[in-house]
Swiss-Prot record:
The species this protein was found in: Mycolicibacterium smegmatis (strain ATCC 700084 / mc(2)155) (Mycobacterium smegmatis)
Catalyzed reactions: alpha-D-glucose 1-phosphate + ATP + H(+) = ADP-alpha-D-glucose + diphosphate
Assigned protein family: Belongs to the bacterial/plant glucose-1-phosphate adenylyltransferase family.
PROSITE patterns noted in UniProt: ADP_GLC_PYROPHOSPH_1, ADP_GLC_PYROPHOSPH_2, ADP_GLC_PYROPHOSPH_3
Keyword match Magnesium: no
Function statement: Involved in the biosynthesis of ADP-glucose building block, required in the biosynthesis of maltose-1-phosphate (M1P) and in the elongation reactions to produce linear alpha-1,4-glucans. Catalyzes the reaction between ATP and alpha-D-glucose 1-phosphate (G1P) to produce pyrophosphate and ADP-Glc.
Keywords: ATP-binding, Carbohydrate metabolism, Glycogen biosynthesis, Glycogen metabolism, Nucleotide-binding, Nucleotidyltransferase, Transferase
Annotated protein name in UniProt: Glucose-1-phosphate adenylyltransferase
GO MF assignments: ATP binding; glucose-1-phosphate adenylyltransferase activity
Note: Maltose-1-phosphate (M1P) is generated by two alternative routes: the TreS-Pep2 branch and the GlgC-GlgM branch, however it seems that the GlgC-GlgM branch provides most of M1P for the GlgE pathway in M.smegmatis.
Pathway participation: Glycan biosynthesis; glycogen biosynthesis
Gene3D superfamilies per UniProt: Hexapeptide repeat proteins (2.160.10.10), Spore Coat Polysaccharide Biosynthesis Protein SpsA, Chain A (3.90.550.10)
Pfam families: Hexapep_GlmU (PF24894), NTP_transferase (PF00483)
One of the GO biological process terms: glycogen biosynthetic process
Length: 404
């Protein structure tokens, strides 16, 4: 029987998420609710746990209370075999300063690595929507002999200029890591596609420690994993790209194989929700062989009364739709839509109340928003613009606890 390598998972969850405002006004970006029953961090944690990586440190910083609480309440492991998922707030172990970048977060947390003494370290971001089996990426990393492996997703070359792009040879070795190039490189097998970094990395431990320490001594560095650490290792010939297309998740459909979304803007966050609602969704939440674990509240089932209906929609537990119409929408837990109300193409987070005869279209309503009887959101954008955030794509975003 092959001895399993000793692996430590580190999840970078300190992001402020300014482009998701107002959803990040009171919480860290990884704590933003998603998909009716989850928070963004649940996707990366589910991927790691499903692959049996059960020693995980979640590095937090910005407005982390709800994130810390979510992890402690919903991600308890047994601990009997040294298993843990633990949030680690910025400790200021090296002086009175916060993290200045993702690489600095690792530098200030080197004690976690020394304590665990792993063979390999998985460093993943906390704010993407996807399924992935990290064990397959780990096997690629070990077999390639690289010191660092970057998960790369293929995008059309014509769209790649907005991302960090990877130029690799046929073996997967990275020749150059280029941030937002005007002329993106093609992949070795397709000149019309480009490898884009997913922000997920695997390192051989000594390679990471040496690179992190060298970066910390560099006064000209921004101390960023993608912007500084990976280019440093690329220059030394030590980095490889893992093709996400080759990742085979148990139970994945042909439609959602290779699905990955960066939901860092309101429009991207909205579009990712719309990927969930069709009969055959672009991203399937119902894969029992690779489950996404989320909130574990003990809630009653959703209820539809007085002819209330929901079509092409996701409706969370505890929600009640009474003589109302819901279409192409995602409703989280404990949402109430009252008589005669219409909700179309919208995302309603936990505890939202839609009053009698109200209309909500093309909108994101954060927790505990109340839309009064007869009120309208997303119908008159000029009026909405005076009081709410509106994305470039015309999505109206209403912050937590607002009464309309």
């Amino acid at each position: 029987m092959r001895e399993l390598p000793h692996v430590l998972g580190i999840v970078l969850a300190g992001g402020e998420g300014k482009r998701l405002y107002p959803l990040t006004a009171d919480r860290a970006k990884p704590a933003v609710p998603f998909g009716g029953a989850y928070r963004l961090i649940d996707f990366v944690l589910s991927n790691l746990v499903n692959a049996r990586y059960l020693r995980i440190c979640v590095l937090t910083q910005y407005k982390s209370h709800s994130l810390d609480r979510h992890i402690s309440q919903n991600w308890r492991l047994s601990g009997l075999a040294g298993e843990y998922i633990t949030p680690v707030p910025a400790q200021q172990r090296l002086g009175p300063r916060w993290y200045t970048g993702s690489a600095d977060a690792i530098y200030q947390s080197l004690n976690l690595i020394y304590d665990e003494d792993p063979d390999y370290i998985i460093i993943f971001g906390a704010d993407h929507v996807y399924r992935m089996d990290p064990e397959q990426m780990m096997q690629f990393h070990i077999e390639s002999g690289a010191g660092a492996t970057v998960a790369g997703i293929r995008v059309p070359r014509s769209e790649a200029s907005a991302f960090g792009c990877i130029d690799a040879d046929e073996s997967g070795r990275i020749r150059e890591f280029i941030e937002k190039p005007a002329d993106p490189p093609g992949t070795p097998d397709d000149p019309e596609q480009t490898f884009v970094s997913m922000g997920n990395y695997i390192f051989t431990t000594k390679v990471l420690i040496d690179a992190i320490r060298a970066d910390a001594d560099d006064d000209h560095s921004d101390h960023d994993m993608g912007g500084d650490i990976i280019p440093r290792l690329v220059a030394d010939g030590m980095a490889a790209v893992y093709d996400f297309k080759n990742n085979e998740v148990p139970g994945a459909t042909e439609r959602d194989h290779g699905y990955w979304r960066d939901v860092g803007t309101l429009d991207a966050f909205y579009d990712a929700h719309m990927d969930l609602v069709s009969v055959h969704p672009v991203f399937n939440l119902y894969n029992k062989r690779w489950p996404i674990r989320g909130e574990s509240e003990n809630l009653a089932p959703a209820k539809f009364v007085n002819g209330g209906s929901a079509q092409e929609s996701v409706v969370g537990a505890g929600s009640i739709i009474s003589a109302a119409s819901v279409r192409n929408s995602v409703l989280s837990s404990n949402v109430v839509v009252d008589d005669g109300a219409i909700v179309e193409g919208s995302v309603l987070m936990p505890g939202v109340r839609i009053g009698r005869g109200a209309v909500v279209r093309h909108a994101i309503l954060d927790k505990n928003v109340v839309v009064g009887p007869g009120e309208m959101v997303g119908v008159d954008l000029d009026k909405d613009r005076e009081r709410f955030a509106i994305s470039a794509g015309g999505v109206v975003a209403v912050g937590k606890g607002v009464w309309i």
